[in-house]
Amino acid sequence: MTLNNVTMRQGTVGMQPQQQRWSIPADGRHLMVQKEPHQYSHRNRHSATPEDHCRRSWSSDSTDSVISSESGNTYYRVVLIGEQGVGKSTLANIFAGVHDSMDSDCEVLGEDTYERTLMVDGESATIILLDMWENKGENEWLHDHCMQVGDAYLIVYSITDRASFEKASELRIQLRRARQTEDIPIILVGNKSDLVRCREVSVSEGRACAVVFDCKFIETSAAVQHNVKELFEGIVRQVRLRRDSKEKNERRLAYQKRKESMPRKARRFWGKIVAKNNKNMAFKLKSKSCHDLSVL
């Protein structure tokens, strides 16, 4: 997945009309409000005129996922958590359409929130992305609040740093304790997959961890923008699978299957048959399917 090529001057920001970015108050007042979606309808929003030449959109070979031209009324609050330096803010910047440059004027110190409306499986959804996990000092209490306010979570680690992978496992346990009675969508994200020679955590380890902790798994590269689009599409699907009616999810699944190749359908069918009679194969099948973000 790549963003459309856009010529940008140093210190400029490319933004879609349906994405917004604002700075969060340092005292965390925004976290004390109720979580109803309508609370976002009165926020100040950045606007973009047709003359803006620094627009960006996610490139896709299909019509499954494009930036919506109209605001949807479905909001998903997604929280990025993980160790420092694993690429959370870079993922957030790509999501927001911000040109990632250390000299960019759009760099904001402190807690950030991004909003973007996507079209996923023919339906619009607005993601409110919170990237404030690394704020420490007097705001350490924000960690506890982050564990409570999300509709979904992206636990990010670097495949080049085993310590960050182990920390991700700890965060999954903490999140389970904080939200014991809730079925919260969680995706374990192995970032920096482009750094093959520096890899310390294998794909199989990431999958096994996701199976053990009952979450989804994907590897991304924020540097080359690989699988970032799929990541945010996937978290929308995971929330929908838990929240919406069975009939509505079945229609979405049918929508996806129409675009699925015959060989993949065959592998899925035979895999289910074999797994019924073999527990070890069932575990392997679950391990392989944990990266399928379109199913529970």
Swiss-Prot record:
GO terms for cellular component: cytoplasmic side of plasma membrane; midbody; mitotic spindle; nucleus; plasma membrane; spindle midzone. InterPro entries: P-loop_NTPase, RGK, RGK_GTP-binding_reg, Small_GTP-bd, Small_GTPase. Phosphorylated on tyrosine residues. GTP binds at residues 82-89, 191-194. GO terms for biological process: cell surface receptor signaling pathway; chromosome organization; immune response; metaphase chromosome alignment; mitotic cell cycle; signal transduction. Residues 266-285 are annotated as: Calmodulin-binding. Residues 1-20, 37-68 are annotated as: Disordered. CDD domains: RGK. Most abundant in thymus, spleen, kidney, lung, and testis. Less abundant in heart, brain, liver and skeletal muscle. It is found in: Cell membrane. It comes from the Eukaryota. Induction: By mitogens. Its main location: membrane. Residues 57-68 have a biased composition (Low complexity). PROSITE patterns: RAS (PS51421). One of its GO terms (molecular function) is GDP binding. Keywords: Calmodulin-binding, Cell membrane, GTP-binding, Membrane, Nucleotide-binding, Phosphoprotein. It is a peripheral membrane protein. Belongs to the small GTPase superfamily. RGK family. Could be a regulatory protein, possibly participating in receptor-mediated signal transduction at the plasma membrane. Has guanine nucleotide-binding activity but undetectable intrinsic GTPase activity. PANTHER family: GTP-BINDING PROTEIN GEM, RAD, GEM/KIR FAMILY MEMBER 2, ISOFORM C. Interacts with calmodulin in a Ca(2+)-dependent manner. Binds ROCK1. This is GTP-binding protein GEM. It comes from Homo sapiens (Human).
